[in-house]
Design a protein with these regions (language model features):
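P-loop NTPase motor core
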Residues: 108-139
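Conserved P-loop
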Residues: 2-108, 116, 120
Length: 139
């Protein structure tokens, strides 16, 4: 089980909307209470679900694509940026994420760099005590 910033990343599921394909990809996940992005390997099981399978790699701050995410309310959301080839984005350091409490249950936003499509997601833990609200709304 992967642990980042004192948080267990498995088991959890991320419900996403608007993703166009099924398969494996790489997401950079902004971990609550942390100013960096951590890479995690994920597998899209169907068009609505994606599961974090494992965590690997070093921590990087957001790439250039995250800069325009400011149009969303940064007080209400975390950010996740999806890349098909993260090597092409490493070094494009722009800014860090806002600091968040590790217990903060609010939703995440996914930015799919391959389609330039922004998606909001909620992280739903299978552990009931970590279950987060299911309400989804755009920032």
């Amino acid at each position: 089980m992967a642990v980042i910033n004192n948080q267990y990343l498995e088991p959890l599921r991320i419900s996403i909307y608007g993703r166009s394909k099924v398969g494996k990809t790489t997401l950079a996940a902004g971990i609550p209470g942390c100013h960096v992005l951590n890479f995690a390997n994920v597998e899209v099981e169907d068009l609505q679900k994606v599961t974090i399978k494992a965590h690997g790699g070093d921590s990087f701050v957001a790439c250039e694509k995250l800069a325009d995410a400011g149009k969303f309310d940064m007080n209400n959301y975390h950010y996740i940026v999806g890349w098909s080839d993260y090597k092409a984005t490493v070094g494009k350091i722009v800014k860090s994420l806002p600091k968040r409490e590790s217990s903060d249950p609010r939703p995440w936003i996914i930015y799919d760099d391959t389609t330039n499509f922004r998606m909001m997601a909620r992280v739903q833990y299978e552990d009931e005590k970590n279950k987060v609200p299911g309400k989804m709304q755009w920032g």
